[in-house]
């Protein structure tokens, strides 16, 4: 994988290297800057990449789970130069991150010639939020079977050549949603995948953008209050309310609110029963307060986007409700992948080709 050359060090590169050496207590900053200038290019070392990825998580204004930023496992995969190799690395990412249900935070960083077209590694074809991406996959020759919760294939591009790959069943860990009391909720046939892996972001370190796949673990509200509940998603609150026997004839019965709480109860119960790590919104917001306290002791300001940090369920009961943050994100950071100005050549995978 070729590395991008720069005639001189940019201010962003200088700032990144300066912060890296300061925070890590690494000597030799003048020598490092001089070596980069003499070479005429900057290609981060593995140590610089690892620090940059961890700090990008620390700086993420949309993430409420930043307390564990130092525990991020960073996989330096910049040398991979085929779609097949990237695909195999992503399968390993899923296995490493799931860790038998003891989910751990992992990031896989690729070279600049790689593009992961999927917004997340695991998404469903019948989820309305994925409608545009499903249309894109259709143009590349994939045909959905029309099943509920059908896992989408991966579209991986390397140096302008795109290939489709199916995720084998053993790579996709899912949890069936049941309720500890209401059997009717379990009869709805709901389920969700255990591992959220964001794959449409780039890691911005010193102005260098590298594609990556980043995963932590779910907060139950992400699944129960958004994915399964939003009207523009799976819109399951009416079905949950019927399973609970609630009066849905008028809004003043608060049937939506009651169904929403019980769906959250069901998701928490189901992940616990399956032995899969899942945060709850009260604990994770308390952890964010601890994160803020640690950062204050280190002399660093915590920035955040309030609407992302405050949960969609009972937000006023959490400690973040009354807090305010500056929203502008600092580098290192995660940024949305830029859309390419070319149409990749599409090839059928010779490995796990998607089924239709």
Swiss-Prot record:
Q: What class of enzyme is it?
A: oxidoreductase
Keywords noted in UniProt: Heme, Iron, Metal-binding, Oxidoreductase
Q: Name one GO molecular function term.
A: heme binding
Family statement: Belongs to the NOS family. Bacterial NOS oxygenase subfamily.
Q: Which GO terms describe its biological process?
A: nitric oxide biosynthetic process
Tell me the protein's name.
Nitric oxide synthase oxygenase
**According to the UniProt entry, how is activity regulated?**
Nitric oxide synthase activity is increased by trpS2.
**Metal-binding is among the record's keywords:** yes
Q: What is its EC number?
A: 1.14.14.47
- Write out the function statement from the record: Catalyzes the production of nitric oxide. The complex between TrpRS II and nitric oxide synthase oxygenase catalyzes the regioselective nitration of tryptophan at the 4-position.
Anything else of interest in the record?
This protein is similar to the oxygenase domain of eukaryotic nitric oxide synthases but lacks the reductase domain which, in eukaryotes, is responsible for transfer of electrons to the ferric heme during nitric oxide synthesis.
Where do the annotations place heme binding? Answer: 63
Could you tell me which PROSITE patterns the record lists for this protein? NOS
Necessary cofactors:
heme; (6S)-5,6,7,8-tetrahydrofolate
Q: PANTHER family given for it?
A: NITRIC OXIDE SYNTHASE (PTHR43410:SF1), NITRIC OXIDE SYNTHASE OXYGENASE (PTHR43410)
| Source species of the chain | Deinococcus radiodurans (strain ATCC 13939 / DSM 20539 / JCM 16871 / CCUG 27074 / LMG 4051 / NBRC 15346 / NCIMB 9279 / VKM B-1422 / R1)
Q: Which InterPro entries match?
A: Nitric_oxide_synthase_Oase-su, NOS, NOS_dom_1, NOS_dom_2, NOS_dom_3, NOS_N, NOS_N_sf
Q: What is the lineage of its organism?
A: Bacteria, Thermotogati, Deinococcota, Deinococci, Deinococcales
Assembly with partners or alone: Homodimer. Forms a complex with trpS2; one homodimer of trpS2 binds one homodimer of nos.
Which reactions fall under this protein's catalytic activity? 3 reduced [flavodoxin] + 2 L-arginine + 4 O2 = 3 oxidized [flavodoxin] + 2 L-citrulline + 2 nitric oxide + 4 H2O + 5 H(+)
């Amino acid at each position: 994988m070729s590395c991008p050359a720069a005639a001189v060090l940019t201010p962003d590169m200088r700032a990144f290297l300066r912060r890296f050496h300061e925070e890590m207590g690494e000597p030799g900053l003048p020598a490092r800057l001089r070596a980069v200038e003499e070479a005429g290019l900057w290609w981060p070392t593995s140590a610089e990449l690892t620090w940059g990825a961890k700090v990008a998580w620390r700086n993420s204004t949309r993430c409420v789970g930043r307390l564990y930023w130092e525990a991020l496992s960073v996989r330096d995969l910049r040398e991979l130069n085929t779609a097949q190799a990237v695909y195999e690395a992503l399968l390993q990412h899923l296995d490493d991150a799931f860790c038998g249900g003891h989910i751990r935070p992992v990031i896989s960083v690729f070279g600049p010639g790689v593009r992961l077209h999927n917004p997340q590694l695991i998404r469903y074809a019948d989820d309305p939020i994925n409608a545009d991406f499903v249309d894109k996959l259709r143009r590349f020759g994939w045909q959905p079977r029309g099943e509920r919760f059908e896992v989408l294939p991966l579209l991986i591009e390397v140096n302008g050549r795109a290939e489709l790959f199916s995720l084998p069943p053993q790579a996709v860990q899912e949890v069936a949603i049941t309720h500890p009391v209401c059997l009717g909720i379990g009869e709805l046939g709901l389920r969700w995948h255990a591992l959220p892996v964001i794959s449409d972001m780039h890691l911005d370190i010193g102005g260098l953008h590298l594609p990556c796949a980043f995963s932590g673990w779910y907060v139950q509200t992400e699944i129960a209050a958004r994915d399964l509940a939003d009207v523009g998603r799976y819109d399951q609150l009416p079905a949950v309310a019927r399973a609970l026997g609630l009066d849905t004839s008028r809004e003043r019965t608060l049937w939506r609110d009651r169904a929403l709480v019980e769906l959250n109860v069901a998701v928490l119960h189901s992940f616990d029963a399956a032995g899969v790590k899942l945060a709850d919104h009260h604990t994770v917001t308390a952890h964010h307060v601890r994160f803020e306290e640690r950062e204050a002791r280190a002399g660093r300001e915590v920035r955040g986007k309030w609407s992302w940090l405050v949960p969609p369920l009972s937000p006023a009961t959490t400690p973040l409700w009354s807090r305010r943050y500056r929203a502008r994100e600092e580098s290192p950071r995660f940024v949305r992948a830029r859309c390419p100005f070319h149409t990749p050549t599409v090839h059928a995978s010779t490995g796990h080709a998607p089924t239709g």
